[in-house]
């Protein structure tokens, strides 16, 4: 309202000044208009006059400038009549004068690019402002400016100038300004209304570049609102010009035809069914065209590789008077120039689609069009720029056809059908529909054009592409979303404003900004400027190896980016030491494009200038690898890659899979993590310009983008906190596969619940708080009752305990550390706040458990063994466990354990009754009643449980149950005692339900433990006389509160004796017999001499019948037997020195005679054995085979090495009788084999039962004398069956032996 009132109240002075502004330049009009408005704010009349005079002077100066601009064009402007556009000059100038916007359509060569600016200049549009003329490429802007200046006969940079990125040839007198569309776009930021221009020519609009489409959209808004005086001329090839007209309210179109000749179109589709491919189709087309007559051929190809393959195939054709010329963007300037300098030979030009509209290849008569091209297309799915090969549009196909109608009639061969052509889209999609829009969106937002969706583009971009552009800018930190009353609004951040200031792609700009934080701005400016241009390193087709060797000097082992830094340093050194021409030649030798090097340097200096203007610090110290690549990474977060196992590819953002491009230094190395400057899809998705990175660099840069997921949180006792495994991903790439994190900060509620349950309820934490220890003690007491009674209903459930703590503990407590802080204050108010009461832990309906039924200790003699209870069905130690200290294992007997503890005894008896076969079990139904009756009568532990049970059941029912009928396998494991042997710290050594098995397996360890607790000196070795103290028959030692009992004995060491402690009295007895015998033999004269003197010759000869080695060994066996007899005759073992001396004298006195006596008996045994063996060697009937085999087995068991001592003196006569019985059996065998067989079967049955008994006996115990006697009872049975006439030692039968065996 204030501004409008000012306008309506202009003073006469102001009105006078405003009336003079129409004749001065637009920029001056805007500047002075603001000053004239300012006069109205000055109160002093005198001051107003002074300012007005100053403004008047500036108006005069501005008028003078306009006059100078008018007079700058002195010569008449010439328009070449040969150009089609010149012939329409009057019509075109009339349209320009009458309309704000016009569209000029014409093919390349019509002259519109060079003549339209001259027409506008002639109309005077250069007087009050510049005639702006945009070109899609920098080289075109420079060359067109030079051409127009030449035609106007003026110096470049004066009347005609140009401005491209980082190169400005403009002066105050410039009226025609050539520039790239990117320059005009950048100028809009500082000159939003384009006041420096009176006319704009947007050339090559048909290319539909992103910049051009944005400029046209911007002008669509600007012209009718702010710049009705601004003229706009849109030039285009004859492609979809109506679209431009409609965009500007049906602006008039004038079509200027180029100089063209008729072109014949021939369709020669490649037929796959005929095994014909595109290359063969091209070769066929070349043959067909050469047959038409001489003329240059232009063949359109998809890319560099196809061009080289086709060139190689054509060279093999040996075409006469023909040269083959490639044309593509990466080609060196020298090779490109060959196209424009005919050599006189027929030329075949192989070109990419750059030759469609942007570049005129002269003298083309024929065109071969395969109908495809690589078209840059943004993939919404993968978020990468693809370069797929696609069928070209009809408009592009017609442009290609038009290349050959310029100099004469031409022929265009299309390698596809006419139907294919007619089915194709009419026009190629504009760039805005197939590219990432991040840069445009950033610039628009910086210009205040926030509503991108409403912006009047010629063709509105895909909404998804807009969102992707926004997401990329969010990735770079350029945008932030704020909540307003009207909803969410996207605002430019400080970083975003800085990105918009830097004249490079947003990704590259982000790298420079990040370099500030990492101290590598200098290096980043070099790399970013290199990434902004085409690679200056050239690789000519015929010199690939040589160029590769030159470029390899600059390579870095880990990064393609660092090659630019190395190259930059090299170029700086070369420039210092060389003149300009020398440097140019050196670049050529090094296969470096000189113009691109200059462009690189120009861009670097422009970036450096911008960086300084933004006051960003530039480092002077050299940056390290990590600094540089972390800064690069900040702009390439969606271009990271994780190596996939066993594949030559990487997992990229959004599940993309890409490979490293073959020209990378990392192509063969394939590190685990990489980043790529760009991802481009051709035959596959390639990562170009790659470097090795570390995953830990990523997360700090991508905090706003990463996603975190967590495993199920668990309590960590060691950390005293709730921990979860965190997985960190960036666009789906796992940058942290797994790491433990404190879950308390992530979800306090869940963490508090887990803390209470795991730490307080379940006890899983390390703490010294008194309340907790007391609570745990009370819980253990109640749990022990549950284990004892094998019930789960005594202790209150975890939920009750959880609620107890939950109601009392602060909500902020999520870990042990938090608890300690809270409890320090809380206990001051109520120290017993968290204490359990015993009654609180017991369920109201739980029955009481008697300590008598479930004792804590088992008493056996003087032993007191700890009992523990475990109610864990299915586990090894389910039930009652007896804890036996290792040194006491030898003292514990199985006696009594079969009765179980009182609390389980009834259940055990019931289970035993139910284990009986049905024929017996039915006599004791119901089993619980009989179990109760049995327990009321029996005296526990007095006799073995089964013996007592058999007796009582027989008393109650009259039914006798045999021992073998009880099936212990069916008895539940918890009813069987578990024996656990423990070390001195109570730690388990071994565990089993078989006590004898434990004793056998741990025998050596028990022996070691007994020796370990013995007094020094009690165990000895290397003794030859009784030089030691009296031996106690039982040795006891206290250890850790229990009595360790052992049994010392003299042990045989062959040449000496020793003293050793044994676990049992039986082991002591066996060892003492051998040890005492050896000590006596060491202290009495040997009887061998006496034996030689007194033994009859016959007896001596008989001894030689021994089949067991040396006769001396047999004699030693006899002597040992004699000593054993004398010890027994003396009264047994002696335990002191005095007793030993008496025994020694007794043995010395009687040893000779007893030895001779034994030797004579042994001679008779050996002689008889020899005779029997001789009889067995004779011929026998086959029917006697089983009997003879049995006899041989019997003889081997009677007479063997060491049989004399082992049998003993009293058994020798029996051995002789047993052998005589064998002789009688052999006599009878021939008479009645069947009778022998029947008797042998009776013996075999008894022998088999005896062997089963031996297998069943505990391994930990030696065989008792009683069991050993059964072996001789079987020999007596043989005498009774085979030689009854010899008589037996006592009454014997197989039944009697069976009854004795069954008792075990």
From Swiss-Prot:
Its EC number is 3.6.4.13. Residues 93-257 form the Helicase ATP-binding domain. It catalyses: ATP + H2O = ADP + phosphate + H(+). A motif (DEAH box) lies at residues 203-206. SMART domains: AAA (SM00382), DEXDc (SM00487), HA2 (SM00847), HELICc (SM00490). Pfam families: DEAD, DUF3418, HA2_C, Helicase_C, OB_NTP_bind. The keyword Glycoprotein does not apply. GO terms for molecular function: ATP binding; ATP hydrolysis activity; helicase activity; RNA binding; RNA helicase activity. Belongs to the DEAD box helicase family. DEAH subfamily. NCBIfam families: DEAH_box_HrpA (TIGR01967), PRK11131.1 (NF008348). This is ATP-dependent RNA helicase HrpA homolog.
């Amino acid at each position: 309202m204030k501004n409008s009132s000012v306008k309506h109240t202009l003073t006469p002075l102001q009105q006078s000044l405003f009336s003079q502004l129409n004749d001065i330049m637009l920029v001056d009009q805007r500047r002075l208009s603001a000053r004239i408005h300012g006069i109205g704010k000055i109160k002093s009349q005198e001051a107003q006059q002074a300012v007005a005079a100053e403004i008047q002077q500036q108006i005069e100066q501005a008028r003078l400038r306009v006059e100078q601009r008018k007079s700058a064009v002195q010569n008449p402007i010439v328009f070449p009549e040969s150009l089609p556009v010149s012939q329409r000059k009057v019509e075109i100038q009339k349209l320009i004068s009458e309309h704000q916007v016009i569209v000029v359509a014409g093919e390349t060569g019509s002259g519109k690019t060079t003549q339209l600016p001259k027409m506008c200049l002639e109309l005077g549009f250069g007087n009050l402002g510049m005639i702006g003329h945009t070109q899609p490429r920098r080289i075109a802007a420079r060359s067109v400016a030079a051409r127009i200046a030449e035609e106007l006969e003026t110096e470049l940079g004066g009347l005609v100038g140009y401005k491209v990125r980082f190169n400005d040839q403009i002066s105050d007198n410039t009226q025609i300004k050539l520039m790239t569309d990117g320059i005009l776009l950048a100028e809009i930021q500082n000159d939003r209304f384009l006041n420096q221009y009176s006319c704009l020519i947007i050339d090559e609009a048909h290319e539909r570049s992103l910049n051009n489409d944005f400029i046209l959209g911007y002008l669509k808004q600007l012209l009718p609102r702010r710049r009705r005086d601004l003229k706009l001329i849109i030039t285009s090839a004859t492609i979809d010009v109506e679209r431009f007209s409609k965009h500007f309210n049906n602006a008039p179109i004038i079509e200027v035809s180029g100089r063209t000749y008729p072109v014949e179109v021939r369709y020669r589709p490649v037929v796959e069914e005929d095994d014909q491919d595109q290359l063969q189709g091209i070769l066929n087309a070349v043959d067909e065209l050469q047959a038409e007559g001489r003329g240059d051929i232009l063949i359109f190809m998809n890319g560099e590789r196809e061009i080289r393959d086709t060139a190689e195939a054509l060279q093999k054709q040996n075409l006469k008077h023909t040269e083959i010329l490639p044309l593509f963007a990466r080609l060196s300037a020298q090779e490109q120039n060959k196209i424009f300098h005919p050599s006189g030979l027929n030329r075949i030009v192989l070109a990419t689609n750059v030759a469609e509209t942007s570049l005129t290849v002269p003298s083309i008569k024929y065109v071969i069009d395969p109908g495809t091209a690589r078209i840059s297309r943004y993939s919404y799915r993968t978020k990468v720029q693809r370069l797929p090969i696609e069928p070209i549009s009809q408009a592009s196909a017609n442009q290609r056809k038009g290349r050959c109608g310029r100099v004469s009639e031409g022929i265009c061969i299309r390698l596809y059908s006419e139907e294919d052509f007619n089915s194709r889209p009419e026009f190629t999609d504009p760039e805005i529909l197939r590219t990432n829009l991040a840069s445009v969106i950033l610039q628009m937002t910086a210009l205040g054009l926030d509503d991108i969706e409403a912006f009047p583009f010629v063709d509105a971009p895909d909404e998804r592409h807009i969102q992707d552009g926004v997401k990329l800018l969010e990735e770079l930190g350029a945008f932030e979303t704020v909540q307003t009353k009207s909803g969410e609004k996207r605002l430019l951040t400080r970083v975003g404003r800085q990105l918009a200031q830097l004249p490079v792609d947003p990704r590259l700009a982000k790298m420079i900004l990040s370099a500030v934080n990492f101290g590598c701005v200098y290096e980043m400016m070099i790399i970013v400027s290199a990434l902004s241009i085409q690679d200056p390193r050239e690789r000519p087709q015929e010199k690939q190896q040589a160029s590769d060797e030159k470029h390899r000097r600059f390579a870095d082992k880990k990064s393609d980016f660092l090659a630019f830094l190395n190259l930059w340093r090299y170029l700086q050194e070369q420039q210092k030491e060389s003149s300009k021409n020398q440097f140019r030649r050196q670049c050529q030798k090094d296969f470096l494009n000189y113009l691109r090097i200059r462009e690189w340097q120009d861009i670097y200096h422009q970036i450096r200038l911008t960086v300084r203007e933004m006051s960003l610090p530039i480092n002077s110290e050299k940056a390290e690898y990590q600094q540089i690549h972390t800064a690069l990474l900040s702009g390439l977060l969606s271009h990271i890659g994780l190596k996939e196992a066993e594949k030559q590819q990487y997992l990229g953002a959004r599940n993309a899979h890409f490979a490293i491009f073959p020209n990378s230094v990392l192509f063969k190395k394939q590190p685990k993590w990489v980043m790529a400057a760009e991802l481009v899809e051709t035959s596959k998705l390639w990562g170009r310009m790659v470097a090795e990175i570390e995953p830990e660099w990523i997360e700090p840069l991508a905090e706003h983008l990463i996603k975190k997921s967590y495993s199920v949180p668990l309590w960590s006792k060691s950390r005293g906190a709730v921990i979860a495994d965190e997985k960190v991903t960036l666009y789906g790439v796992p940058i942290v596969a797994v790491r433990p994190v404190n879950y308390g900060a992530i979800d306090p509620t869940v963490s508090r619940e887990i803390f209470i349950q795991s730490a307080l309820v379940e006890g899983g934490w390390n703490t010294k708080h008194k309340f907790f220890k007391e609570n745990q003690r009370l819980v253990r007491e109640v749990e022990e009752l549950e284990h004892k009674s094998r019930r789960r209903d005594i202790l209150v459930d975890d939920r009750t305990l959880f609620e107890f703590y939950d109601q009392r503990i602060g909500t902020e407590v999520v870990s042990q550390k938090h608890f300690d802080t809270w409890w320090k204050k809380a206990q001051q108010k109520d120290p017993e706040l968290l204490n359990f009461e015993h009654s609180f832990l017991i369920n109201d309906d739980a029955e009481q458990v008697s300590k008598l039924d479930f004792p804590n200790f088992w008493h056996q003699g003087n032993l007191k063994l700890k009992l523990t209870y475990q109610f864990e069905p299915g586990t090894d130690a389910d039930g009652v466990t007896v804890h036996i200290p290792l040194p006491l294992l030898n003292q514990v007997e199985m006696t009594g354990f079969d009765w179980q503890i009182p609390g389980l005894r009834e259940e055990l008896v019931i289970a035993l009754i139910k284990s009986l076969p049905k024929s017996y079990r039915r006599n004791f139904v119901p089993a619980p009643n009989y179990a109760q009756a049995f327990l009321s009568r029996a005296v526990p532990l007095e006799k073995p449980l089964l013996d007592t049970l058999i007796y009582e059941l027989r008393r109650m029912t009259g039914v006798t149950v045999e021992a073998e009928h009880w099936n212990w396998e069916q008895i539940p494991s918890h009813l069987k005692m578990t024996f656990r042997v423990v070390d001195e710290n109570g730690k388990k050594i071994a565990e089993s339900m078989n006590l004898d098995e434990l004793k056998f397996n741990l025998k050596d360890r028990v022996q070691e433990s007994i020796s370990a607790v013995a007094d020094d000196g009690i165990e000895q070795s290397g003794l030859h006389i009784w030089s030691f103290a009296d031996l106690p028959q039982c040795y006891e030692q206290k250890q850790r509160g229990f009595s360790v009992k052992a049994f010392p004995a003299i042990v045989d060491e062959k040449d000496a004796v020793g003293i050793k402690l044994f676990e049992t009295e039986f082991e002591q007895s066996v060892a003492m017999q051998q040890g005492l015998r050896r000590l006596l033999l060491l202290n009495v004269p040997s009887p061998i001499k006496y034996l030689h003197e007194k033994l009859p010759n016959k007896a001596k000869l008989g001894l030689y019948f021994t089949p067991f080695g040396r006769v001396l060994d047999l004699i030693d066996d006899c002597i040992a037997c004699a000593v054993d007899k004398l010890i027994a005759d003396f009264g047994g073992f002696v335990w002191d020195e005095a007793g030993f001396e008496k025994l020694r004298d007794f043995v010395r006195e009687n040893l000779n005679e007893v030895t001779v006596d034994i030797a004579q008996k042994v001679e008779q045994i050996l002689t008889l054995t020899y005779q029997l063996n001789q009889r067995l060697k004779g011929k026998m009937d086959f029917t006697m085979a089983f009997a003879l085999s049995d006899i041989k087995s019997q003889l081997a068991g009677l007479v063997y090495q060491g049989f004399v001592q082992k049998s003993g003196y009293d058994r020798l006569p029996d051995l002789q009788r047993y052998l005589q019985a064998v002789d009688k059996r052999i006599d009878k065998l021939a008479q009645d084999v069947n009778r022998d067989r029947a008797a042998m079967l009776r013996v075999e049955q008894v022998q088999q039962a005896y062997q089963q008994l031996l297998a069943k006996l505990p391994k930990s115990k030696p065989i008792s004398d009683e069991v050993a006697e059964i072996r001789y009872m079987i020999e007596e049975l043989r005498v009774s069956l085979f030689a009854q006439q010899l008589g037996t030692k006592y009454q014997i039968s197989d039944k009697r032996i069976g009854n004795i065996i069954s008792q075990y």
